[in-house]
Amino acid sequence: MSFAPLQNDTFLRACRRQATDYTPLWLMRQAGRYLPEYKATRAKAGSFMGLATNVEYATEVTLQPLERFPLDAAILFSDILTVPDAMGLGLSFAEGEGPRFAKAVRDEADVAALAVPDLDKLRYVFDAVTSIRRALNGRVPLIGFSGSPWTLACYMVEGKGSDDYRLVKTLMYSRPDLMHRILAVNADAVAAYLNAQIDAGAQAVMVFDSWGGVLADGCFQDFSLEYTRRVLAQLKRTGVDGQDVPRIVFTKGGGIWLDDMKDIDCEVLGLDWTAHLGKARAIVGGQVGGPGKALQGNIDPNVLFAPSAQIVTQVRAVLDSFGTPHTDKTTTGPTHIFNLGHGISQFTPPEHVAALVEAVHGYSRSLRQR
């Protein structure tokens, strides 16, 4: 499988802690409902799953934000719940309600029946990865992704999204043996799923631990981080083009556990807006010439509802909080990939995103010229 050579490798260089001319950026959920063109494609597809399972539509919506904004990476258009769906839990999206499963995993029999799914059931995802990579034609790198074992388990046990995580936490505290079994299956499934995305052409992969932050200290380490480690240990290190494939881990609410996360086997840690990039850099960013992790994040997505002048101010505050970027192209050092602290809201005005992108690229260039 061969693809066009990469023209803009700024994002991948930053993942590898190599100096870049400016701070690269992409946005979580950058292909989505805030774009009128996305809504038009979704209407054609008839439903969210109709969109996600159709290679042509998934390719179209992945590229839509890149047609509007000079972003530095594309991310596969899909959903984290495709893996439990392939396990036979029956995923559906009711209009305005969010995801739900026809079958939840709550007792011994449910857990005993769980297995790593046949990856052929997810062929539509891998076909989309290859199609998107071809359509990008080397413009920017393509990121593949999955939910974390813990985050998938939250949906699998609850049967849908939750405000209090009562059912999944009840199972965790009362039958930790069952919880560990679910998480072990999930970890092996996520690793196989991400490896198949890498084989299909993904140039970086990201694990979204969206609900890791709801766990108590101690439980996070045992029930979330431990199984994220299990995923990372199984991931392929080389992509189809012979290049290394950076691994990104994002735990929403995980900034308090950076000491625990600094030694996990990934290249990039994502942070939400509650973390301070400079403090995170001191813990995990490393020194010039030494080991460390790149950081990704972490502006509050709600900043995008403010007027453009305030967006620029907040962008500068985030870039300043990371500190002086490393500029020595002969070695590695602390690097930053600009992103939101969570997914973009569907109500965001697209012109505000344009202001954000322009501010990130412009101000981060000027920081390197001081």
Swiss-Prot record:
Pathway per the UniProt entry: Porphyrin-containing compound metabolism; protoporphyrin-IX biosynthesis; coproporphyrinogen-III from 5-aminolevulinate: step 4/4
Q: Where in the cell is it found?
A: Cytoplasm
Going by the entry's taxonomy, the superkingdom of the source organism is recorded as Bacteria
Pinpoint the site Transition state stabilizer.
Answer: 79
TM annotation in the entry: none
Q: What is its EC number?
A: 4.1.1.37
Q: Which GO terms describe its molecular function?
A: uroporphyrinogen decarboxylase activity
Q: Which cellular component, as a GO term, is one annotated location?
A: cytosol
Keyword terms, alphabetized? Cytoplasm, Decarboxylase, Lyase, Porphyrin biosynthesis
- Which enzyme type, at the first EC level? lyase
Q: Which residues bind substrate?
A: 29-33, 79, 155, 210, 342
Q: Which reaction does it catalyse?
A: uroporphyrinogen III + 4 H(+) = coproporphyrinogen III + 4 CO2
| Any one biological process term the GO annotation gives | protoporphyrinogen IX biosynthetic process from glutamate
Please give the InterPro entries that the UniProt record associates with this protein: UROD/MetE-like_sf, Uroporphyrinogen_deCO2ase_HemE, Uroporphyrinogen_deCOase
Which family would the database say this protein is a member of?
A: Belongs to the uroporphyrinogen decarboxylase family.
Summarize the subunit comment: Homodimer.
In its UniProt entry, what is this protein called?
A: Uroporphyrinogen decarboxylase
Q: Which organism is it from?
A: Acidovorax ebreus (strain TPSY) (Diaphorobacter sp. (strain TPSY))
